[in-house]
Amino acid sequence: LQVAQDVEEIVRQNGAAAATIAVIAGKVHVGLEPDQLELIANANDVVKASVRDLAIVQTLKQSAATTVSATAHIAHLAGMKVFATGGLGGVHRGQNYDESADLIALSNTPIVVISAGVKSILDVGATLERLETFAVPVLGFKTNIFPGFYLKDSGFTLDTQVDSVDQIAEIFQARQELQTNNTAMVVANPAPNQMNPELHDKLLTQGLSECKKQNVTGKAVTPFLLEYFHSNSNGESLRINIEIIKSNAKLAAQIAQAISKK
């Protein structure tokens, strides 16, 4: 809850309107009151909703935190041009048909998404290939290296580095003029202070091994691995998560401000 409140304050301090997105008792909310923010942060019956789940969640009157795909869809419907998240979903390791719905949403939703890359527990190379196939531009903010969420360097380089929010706003405007803006535009913003790479690699290897032992498959893999990192990193995973979302919220607000001036 404190992190969510801090993030909204960071957005306001950087000249943009903060609008946290969630579903509460079947109703989509763009912007939350303090008590609603508390409910989403602390309630035990909050489900995770992708874009495919939104109609079901609404009909069943459930409360839900939204994935990147659902957040992008709702934000676009609400007329928002920019949103911040932690890490993107993508292609799972060794399972070519196991892909996050985030990728499809990015392929058909005209919005700017700021993230710290894709989670390093995924197949980063395959995810970047899919984004290229879907004509989704990926810009590195002050870097030409694609970040891997916990790490600044996923091992993959980017074609485009941008060094200012004004540049990003200009590209946003050019996409509108050229009518190439029917997809999302991803801005990759590396974690301010990455996890120790040796610790990361050890946890990833152990976590993947535990997945196989416990026969964890499908959409259960990502939360399982994230929880494994959280439980076995002595707070490092949580620290980085918090730093990432605050850093991305700040950059998103600055980009939104720059776009509004064009």
For each feature predicted by the language model, list its residue ranges.
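Short, solvent-exposed amphipathic alpha-helical segments in soluble enzyme
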Residues: L1-D6, A126-T133, F149-Y150, S154-T157, ...
